[in-house]
Amino acid sequence: VARRRFDVSSVHERRRALRSELTAGRRLVGTFVKLANADIVEMAAAAGFQFVVVDLEHSTLTEVDALGLVRHADAGGVPALVRVPAVDPPLIARLLENGAVGIQLSMLRTAEQARRLMAATHFAPSGERSVSLANRVAGFGATSLRDFLQLEAEAPPLLVGQIETGIAEPWPDVLHGLDVAFVGTTDLSVNLGLPSIGELSAAVERVRLAAEAAGVAFGGWSASLSAAPAQGLAEAGYLVVGSDLQILAAGLRAALSPEGGN
C-alpha cells in the first residue's frame, strides 16, 4: 500500500524567517492571545500581525487551550510563540512539539534562568530537552531522528526574555542565548517603585543598549503601534501590540461612546 505523504509542520521555516527578519533589523509586530478561540489567531494574521504570542501568564488559558491555539496557528502558517511564567521543561517540550516557534519567558532576572531556558528548548549536546518523534513537528515519525535533530539544530526555537526588574548580574550573561531582550515596561515600572517618565525611559534605554551590545534584538510591549516611541520602543525590532482582550474591550467601550461605533 502506497503511503500518503504527510506534510510535516513548517515551524522550522517560520523560525528561520522570523530570525532572519530580526537579524536584518526589520521590525516584527505581533499581539498577545489570551482568549481560547482559534478565530483570534486568524483575525490577527488577516489584520497584518506577523506573529502571535499565546499567553500562559496573564490569562485564563489552560495548557490544553494553549496547545490548541498553537496547533491551529501552525496549521495555518501563523508563527506562534508562547509566553510562560517560569521554565517548565515538560510544558515547554509539549508546546514546541505542537508547533510553537518559540518561548517567551517572563521575569528574566538571572543568567541561571537563561541557561535553564536554553536547556529546556535545545536537544543535547547544547541542551537537555527530551527527544520524541511522536508529534506534529516531527511528522509523527515521518521525519527521521537524524533529520529532525538537524532541523532543530539549524532552526532552534526563538527565545525571548522579558526584562521587568533591575538586573544585578552582567547583562551579557543574562542575555546569552536569547534572540530578543523584551522590556516589560509595566512590571519594570512597578518593580522600580513607579519612577518618573524620565527614569523609566532611562531604564528602558539601558535594556536597549544591553541588547545591542549582546547582539540580540530589542523588543517590548505597547498598547498601540503609535504609542511605542513614547515608551522608548521606537527601535524595537520585536514589538507586541496590545492583546485580543484589550482590543476587544476597547472596541466595546468605543461602541457605546457618542463618538465611536461607526
How would you label these PLM feature ranges?
Residues 34-36, 57-59, 85-87, 108, ...:
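Active-site beta-loop-alpha junctions enriched in small/polar residues
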Residues 69, 73, 111-127, 245-262:
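C-terminal helical cap(s) of enzyme catalytic domains, especially alpha/beta-barrels
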